[in-house]
Amino acid sequence: AGLLTPQQGRVQRGFTRCAVMFQQPRLLPWQRTLDNIALGLRAAGHARAQAREAAAQMGRRVGLDEAALQAWPHQLSGGMQSRAALARALVLSPELLLMDEPFAALDIGLKAQLQQLLLAETARHGSALLMITHDPAEALRLADRVLVLAGRPGRIVHEQRLSVAPAARS
């Protein structure tokens, strides 16, 4: 973001379209769900009508109906808020998608549904996905490469490359 100057080395960024999905949905309470989903597109300079149409389409893909798209964030269940947050990230068709425990608080059915959508969307757009999870099964389901980290000081203690594509795993 350019907020800090590197003390050594240099920072290179090869991706121009990036999106982030946090562990908490982080929806703006003063924006309806549809406008929360369209937020990144609007920030990127898309016309309001175009951004809202793309947001509505992605909202429907993640399972949000018209009532949910017109609702305020506090009117949505936790699962619906997570759907909106995922839609907000995916609508950007990111080259790089950063996710921090995106499915941690979801029930198993919704988690599986959103994971399948995530795999389909990242494959469709050729997105790189970097995800933090404490769920080894989730990592094995979604990743082609898993890094296990240990803390203090943070370091990689194990790396596993998976030979079967995520979409082919059950």
For the regions a language model picked out, list residue spans one by one.
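Conserved H-loop
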Residues: 126-132
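Conserved ABC ATPase "signature" region
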Residues: 49-67, 120
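Short helical segment in ABC ATPase nucleotide-binding domains corresponding to the A-loop/adjacent helical element
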Residues: 34-42, 52, 56, 161
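Hydrophobic anchor residue at the start of the ABC signature
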Residues: 86
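Conserved ABC ATPase signature
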Residues: 72-76, 80
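Catalytic Walker B motif of ABC-type/P-loop ATPase nucleotide-binding domains
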Residues: 97-101
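Conserved signature/switch motifs of ABC ATPase nucleotide-binding domains
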Residues: 92
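Helical segment within the ABC ATPase nucleotide-binding domain
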Residues: 111-125
